[in-house]
């Protein structure tokens, strides 16, 4: 959350879920969003699929998308593609805006996952090494600027799950709190109880590049362990 504007920059889906559960509060990590150390990337979807060329074609045709197919090359901009395989680059003929492209990426992900293939999320820069990996199909998503993320958040529009990837100086993890604390207390009481709760846990500082729960992070991690 931006410390100045209090705009929720990441985690809107979790925030909405808490609201539906009747929570009055939510734990938040406040950041100076204009800090140059804070960067924005994206989460690409990686699959190890059987017959990826046919699967990509079937996914796009099932969603009534008109596309052109070109040979995959290191010179291609991966963020402009809709689906990439090790042989082909599938790109829409009529390119929608960034938000629509994100929504389409999620629909394609659901289609391919529905064919019993497991999706793995990795940073956009992982696509440069993927030709040497087991993955053979990638669904890229556009990369938003900070200004675009702020504009989207303040307009009330919601980006799909796991699209933006924020890189912050230090990322807290394991801030697990009982729902009771978020529902039945005032802000002052909830903050005091949260402070005591986190102070009672062991803090494990992990260096950039560490993996937690199958996800690799570029920033330092502050993991609150039970």
Question: What positions do the PLM features span?
Answer:
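Short, surface-exposed beta-edge/turn micro-motifs
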Residues: 5-6, 79-80, 133-138
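Long, compositionally biased intrinsically disordered regions
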Residues: 104, 126-188
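A short, basic-hydrophobic beta/loop patch
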Residues: 1-7, 13-48, 167, 224-226
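Amphipathic, charge-rich alpha-helical segments that serve as recognition/docking helices
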Residues: 32-89, 148-161
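Short Lys/Arg-enriched alpha/beta "domain-start" segment
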Residues: 75-115
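Alpha-helix/helix-capping structural signal
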Residues: 12-13, 144
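Charge-dense, extended regions
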Residues: 166, 179-226
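A C-terminal functional module that forms or caps the active site or interfaces directly
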Residues: 115-121, 168
